[in-house]
Structure formats: structure tokens, C-alpha cells
């Protein structure tokens, strides 16, 4: 008997709960039937023809996906916050068991047709059509999510130290200002307007290439077109240049250093031209790689392209000047005569200013005259008859080829009567004179050739200093100009 009672009590409780749930569902269904009995979603919710429907527009950013500079397109993941009042969707919560809000499919209610006007893919539709939230006061709020691909004009002058101002323009696609007026969205308390893009910190993922500096919004209208009105959201972002500094700028600086060190490489090394041309090819490769990163525009030249062109010009001149230096280095008296102005500038004037000192040649011990002894009354010239005619005092004389002939004449003219030299001695004297002249000519040839090599070395050192100064000034001036390119504190100033 007790068990029967318990079973009966359970059945009563279950039936009561079931009836209560069915009643709530029926009441909500009844409310929807009453609200939409004569509701037409195609009709603007204005009580009179002249009334304007106020639509509040806000934007919540969840992710800045990518900014494609090549096609000038920004891809973002956002929530569009729309709110308006529909007087036809009002009811008394007390008459419907305290129901204060309803969630209704967005296709069943009127929509203001707010679309992204500067979309880049031709798609004006919302990605996900979520339900709208309708309150008993007639307030309607709709927060659809979307992945927008908007056009963004890229200013490439200071790339990669640039900042961009990308806009997202929203307006009603079918209504003008005489029917729908746009306003900024309100905050959670409904007290003040939110005139900026809201960032959802819980869902936001920071972009690895761009940092968000400012995110204001503004209502725009045209004085020449009173029917036009839009709400524009500005996303001012600054590039993080670390990637380009590490992978482009630092290698270019190293290449420029190699181009400068070309002038420190001795011409006899044989790799002067190879190093110059290799540096030129490296800069060309970097220039081609960066061509795929920036838009194809003629409005301005990116600062990194200007720097690469600057380095390329320097390297090209280093190749040309290396040819000049090698030409100077391999000149000889047989092919070129050194002008006096070259000798004056490159041998006498410039070396002290370039910290170059030419080594002073000192005679080696092997080049000292050889001293021999000759005994008293020694004769070295013989008459044809066989007796000696030239006595020589006991002395130490130096045997030098260039003085031998003059000494013979002195002995012949000073101590004895003139005699005729034998033919074999004449030939020996002529041979010695020829050897002396050849030695002197070879010495002069070597000296002139070394002068040309010295001129080439001075020119190399001069180009080294000049290129170092030009490269340093050019590098600092170009990147110093980029350091002044910062986003403004007031975007609308």
C-alpha cells in the first residue's frame, strides 16, 4: 500500500512539471504568434513615413588575420554590433508570464542592411546569421560574426618602418538618411557612445607582423550629398620591422661592407673583381625578393628599395673603380707614361692624408763596391810590343763597371802617353758599358712600374675612405628619415 502511494505521488509531481513546461512553451509561442501576426519584415519600423529609424553600429575585433600589401587587402575577424528599436515588437511581460526577451531568427525581423562598403571580394553578406535578441521594449540587438576582406590603401614610402590606416566603411545598402540614421553603439551600461573598435581581449589574437596603435571610429557625411551617411572604423596599425631588419637590412649592410672592403683587397690577389660582382649579384637578388612584397605603385618608392638601390649603385661603382685600379696597377713604362699631375697628386700629395708611407729603399750589403788590392808597379795595359806602359801606384780602388772606362782614360791621359787600346779590351769595355746601361734601364723600368703600382694602391685607399663615408652617411640618413615616421597621436588632427 505504501508503495502505491509513493508511485501515485511521483506521477502527480511529474505531471505538474510537464504541465508547467508546456505552459511556458505555449506562452512563448503565443507571444510570437501575436507579435508576428501582422508583422512584415520588409517594412521599415517607422510609425510615420517621416520618422527615421536610428541604427547604432559598433564593431568588435577578435583577430587581425592578415594585411596583404601586394593586393592592398586587410582580412579581419569581427563581430558587427547592430541595435535599433522596432515598435512592432513590444509587449507587456506581465501578460506573458514575465517573458522579457525573445531570440528570433534574423530573417524573421526587419534588418537595416548594414554592409561593408569597401569590401575587396564583392561579398556584402554576413558570414553567420545568428538570432537577434528582442526585448519587450522593442529594442533589437544583433551581433553577427564575419570575416571581412576590406580594401586598404598601402603607403609604401617607409616600408618596412611604415604604419597603415585601414578603414572599414559601414552604411545601409538600401536606405538613405531620410529613412535610416546611423549612430555609434552604446556601452554595456547604455550611457555613452563607443567611438572606437572594441577588442575582445578573451578571444583576440595578436598579429605577429602588425601592432594596433589606434582604433577610432567616426560618423561621416557629405555636404554635397545630404542623403549619404556612414560609420567608418579606422584601424591604425604599425609594422613590426624585426623580420625585415634581420633578413634584409642587416644582410644589405654586410654586403655594403664587402663592397667597401673590395678596395682593401690587393690587386695581386686576383679576387678583386669576383668579390665586387658577387656583391652586386647579392644586392640584385634582395631587390627581386622585395619586389614581391610591396604593391606595384608609382606613387612612391619604399625606403628599403631606396636603400637597396643606393647599395647597388655603390657596388656598381666599386666594380667600375676596381677596373680602374687594376688598370693602374698593371701599367708599365712600355705602355703608359705617367703624367706629372698624377705623380704630384697620388705620389706626393695624397699619401700623407691617407696614412700611407712609401718604404724608403736602402742599399743592401751585396751592392757595395768590391775592394781589391793591386801591388806596386803593377801594369795592366800592355803595348803591342809586349812591355807595360802604365804603372799603377799601390792603392785600393773600387771596381765599378760604370767608372771603369773613365779610370782607364785617366790612367792613359794622366800617367802615360796615349796609347791605342787592343780590340779585345775595347769590346770588353763596350760590353761592360752595355751591361751597365741595361742594368740602369731595368732599374728605371722597375721604379716606374712600382710607381704605377703605388698610384693604384693610393687610389684604392682613397676609394676605400670615400666609399666608407658615403655608405655611412647614406645609411644613417635613410634610416634616420624612417625613424620620424610614427603614427599620429590624434588620428583626426
From Swiss-Prot:
Catalytic activity: K(+)(in) = K(+)(out); Na(+)(in) = Na(+)(out)
Topology term for the membrane: Multi-pass membrane protein
Extracellular side: 25-240
CDD domains: LGIC_TM_nAChR
Cytoplasmic compartment residues: 329-461
Matching InterPro entries: Neur_chan_lig-bd (IPR006202), Neur_chan_lig-bd_sf (IPR036734), Neur_channel (IPR006201), Neuro-gated_channel_TM_sf (IPR036719), Neuro_actylchol_rec (IPR038050), Neurotrans-gated_channel_TM (IPR006029), Neurotransmitter_ion_chnl_CS (IPR018000), Nicotinic_acetylcholine_rcpt (IPR002394)
List of glycosylated residues: 165
Secretion signal, residue range per the UniProt entry: 1-24
Entry-linked SUPFAM superfamilies: Neurotransmitter-gated ion-channel transmembrane pore, Nicotinic receptor ligand binding domain-like
Source taxon at top rank: Eukaryota
One annotated GO molecular function: transmembrane signaling receptor activity
Modified residues (Phosphotyrosine): 379
Subcellular location: Postsynaptic cell membrane; Cell membrane
Cellular component aspect of the GO annotation: postsynaptic membrane
Transmembrane stretches, start-end: 241-265, 273-291, 307-328, 462-480
Reported function: After binding acetylcholine, the AChR responds by an extensive change in conformation that affects all subunits and leads to opening of an ion-conducting channel across the plasma membrane.
NCBIfam families documented for this protein: LIC (TIGR00860)
Name listed for the protein in its UniProt record: Acetylcholine receptor subunit beta
Organism phylogeny: Eukaryota, Metazoa, Chordata, Craniata, Vertebrata
Gene assigned in the entry: CHRNB1
